[in-house]
Design a protein with these regions (language model features):
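C-terminal helical cap(s) of enzyme catalytic domains, especially alpha/beta-barrels
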Residues: 202-206, 229, 242-263
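Glycine-rich phosphate-binding active-site loops on the catalytic face of alpha/beta enzymes
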Residues: 127-147, 185-193, 231-252
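Conserved, mostly hydrophobic/aromatic
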Residues: 7, 53, 78, 86, ...
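N-terminal active-site wall of soluble small-molecule enzyme domains
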Residues: 55, 61-163, 169-174, 200-203
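Active-site beta-loop-alpha junctions enriched in small/polar residues
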Residues: 10, 56-58, 91, 118-119, ...
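Catalytic cores of alpha/beta
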Residues: 120-132, 167-178, 215, 219-238, ...
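Catalytic-face loop-and-helix region of soluble metabolic enzyme cores
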Residues: 182-224, 229-238
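An N-cap/entry alpha-helix motif that binds or orients negatively charged groups
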Residues: 2-68
Length: 269
């Protein structure tokens, strides 16, 4: 069984347990009361290098990264460094994330917050809104076409935005009609957790017209960003390097100060 299969099996069990503890109707009522959504796509649309800075305690491929991190402190540092948005892992079994991490991070900043998890069920969409997130991750690889379309529509209907994640050409073809405003291109193969940092550049020009590409995974340095800018996106989702950094705010300042026009590549926008 692959890492991804293990994660999805655990997630199905987690959803079933959550339903027993809290009916979906309760979450629907909380979601309906939300009037404080922060614009996720709008934050990424601004000029220059835009970074979604991630709060992540652990991962299946790396094990513990920084299990004792303070999500509020890290979120404040990310905002001070010029992050465009936050991404917070809420998956507990493999990434040691939690709803509490997301709530604590969002409470101390004005940045839009992406819930990073394995969303499979409408229950989780309402749960995402109820916990205070502004956007959620939808991974094309783990959803069939009907589920992808219905979860996207449900999210939009209650005010949530989506980052729709692809990994290869087949995924890219599947979202042509959906045309999501923001598309994450994961350089990491979720089945085996192998990373190929050239993947985002190869797929950026295969996206639907109007979809903003975000490169995710394997970005650790200014050189990585320069290389990506030369032929691909100017938006990045970065976690491990920032979580490990002694001064994440300063690192973000360095990265976001890079000039897209100075790279001289064929950015797909």
């Amino acid at each position: 069984m692959s890492f991804l299969d293990q994660i999805l099996a655990a997630k199905q069990a987690e959803i079933a347990a959550a339903r027993r503890l809290r009916p979906q109707a309760d979450l629907e009522r909380l979601a309906a009361k939300r009037d404080d959504f922060r614009g996720f796509a709008a934050a990424l649309a601004r000029p220059g290098v835009r970074i979604i800075a991630e709060i992540k305690r652990a991962s299946p491929s790396l094990g513990d990264i920084r299990p004792d991190l303070d999500p509020a402190d890290l979120a404040a540092a990310y905002e001070a460094g010029g992050a465009a948005a936050l991404s917070v892992l809420t998956e507990p079994a493999f990434f040691k994330g939690s709803t509490k991490d997301l709530k604590r991070a969002r409470a101390v900043t004005e940045l839009p917050v992406l819930r990073k998890d394995f969303i499979l069920d409408p229950y989780q969409v309402y749960e995402t809104a109820a916990m205070g997130a502004d956007a959620m991750l939808l991974i094309v690889r783990i959803l069939d076409d009907d589920a992808l379309a219905s979860l996207t529509a449900l999210a939009q209907g209650i005010g949530l935005e989506c980052l729709v994640e692809i990994h290869d050409k087949a995924d890219a073809r599947r979202i042509l009609d959906l045309a999501p405003p923001v598309v994450g291109i994961n350089n990491r193969d979720l089945a085996h957790f192998r990373t190929d940092t050239s993947q985002a550049a190869r797929l950026a020009n295969r996206l639907p017209r109007g979809s903003a590409p975000v490169a995710a995974s394997g970005i650790h340095s200014a050189d990585d960003i320069r290389q990506a800018l030369a032929s691909g996106p100017r938006r990045f989702l970065i976690g491990e390097a920032l979580v490990k950094a002694p001064n994440p705010a300063e690192l973000l300042r360095q990265w976001t100060s890079l000039k897209v026009s100075e790279v001289g590549g064929r950015n797909p926008e």
